[in-house]
Amino acid sequence: MEKSKFEQREYQDFVINFVKNQFSRQRNVIIELDCGLGKRIIMMRLLTDLLSDKKVLAVLHSSSSLAETVKFFNENTNLDFGWLNSRTNKYFRKKLIESKNVIFTTPQIARNLISQGVSFSDFDVLIINEVDKILKRVSTARSILVQPWNSILEAFKTKRIVGMSGTLRDAHAIQTENNVYMASELLTLKSLINAEIITMDEIMKQSDVEKYINKTKIVIVPVYDKNIVSLIQELDQKISAIFHEMKERGIIKDLGKSHKDIVLPHIGDIQYDMFLRLTLLRKYLIAMTPKKARKMWMMSKNSLQIAELSKIPIVDKAPKIDMLFEIIKEKKSSKVIVLCSYKDMVNEIYLRAKKQGFEAFKLTGEVFDKKEMISNFEKIGENAILIISPVGERDLDFSTVNDMFIVDVINTTKTMYQRIKRIRGGHVYILYYKRTSEERKVKRLLRRIKEKYPWSVEIISY
């Protein structure tokens, strides 16, 4: 059945044998396999070998991931499978489900089929890609699962389940009537689907996986601008003061040293509203160009009464952009990826890159054909820059790029680790304004990443 020419690796055999052993004991399985180690190849080997005589539903979390998986299986196997997306005719969906042993689809389509009365009773196995995404980041004890996973898991409650992910080491918050506590995603998933877990630690101890891990060097890059730093520091002080007042009132729940405190929603509370406004304006200043940030500040100046708005220069470039191109020039980087939170910054870096003679590409949610743009970027041998917004970066991997820049970070360890691993190995430069809360945020985040994924990253200073 298999036409693949992929090298068979010891660690893959180890994982497949683990699944085989657990299935023989009627147990479900969760596989932790780091980014870049071939979860799709593991899925291929499961479907073409271990589960070749079984009826399997494989669920991918996005339409782009579904399309890439279908392409991969078409190009590398002779597997007779079907796939369902939002454009698949409902009568054809039923026919495929009845006639094919392997079906690829998304959670939404699976849920729609179940709600329409389609039965999966003759299926044997459910494979969940990125299994961590079935959990809510903040939930009540009665509502832990992201919709539509309640109905999907219910439909497969007597079947075997295989969940796979490279990021299973975060915690999720569970809110009770009087408290909030943190729970391990891995342990919650284990309990939910009655699964045995194979972790990266076990795979590293008992297989050859280490020789296939490309360690990423994370370079932390301080940026300094007197005006911007002084404004961020002023905001830091105001936010800190409000934060401590809200903590005394019980709006903020202290989750201990190992977790970030949670701010519970208090709609209509003046202090809570001001806290949100200030943190958002700080984010603008950190992640936007000064010109755009100043516009956003001006919209809120009456309510905030901050007198130093004039300190934000009205210019067409930002200190972080200056530093970015300085490093590119110094390192003589030939192909570069830049990740930004806002389209304003994407556009500014794109224009600067064009002026400096780079082949520049920008990938946002507005781009209709991501595949074509990425293909054009990859075809260029050197002197190319691809600037990406958070919407544009979903489900992307760039194994041939050695240098990536992250203009600003978010607090979620899992999401930042996934961004860092968009490239395999190489250097990831994270820019931050020094002597501000952003510096503390970046260093705290990288400590957590290093603790959770020590085999995968090395952190160095610029």
Map each language-model feature to its residues.
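Helicase motor interdomain insertion/brace
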Residues: 152, 189-218, 227-344, 348
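Conserved helicase ATPase core of P-loop NTP-dependent helicases/translocases
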Residues: 88-97, 335-339, 344-351, 358-390
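Conserved pre-motif I regulatory segment
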Residues: 1-30
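Conserved helicase ATPase motor motifs in RecA-like P-loop NTPase domains
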Residues: 34-37, 132-133, 155-180
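A short beta-strand element within the Helicase C-terminal
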Residues: 122-127, 387, 394-409, 427-431
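Conserved SF2 helicase motif VI
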Residues: 411-428
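SF2 helicase catalytic motif II
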Residues: 107-110, 117-162
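Conserved Walker A/P-loop ATP-binding site and its immediately adjacent core
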Residues: 35, 40-45, 53-75, 170-171, ...
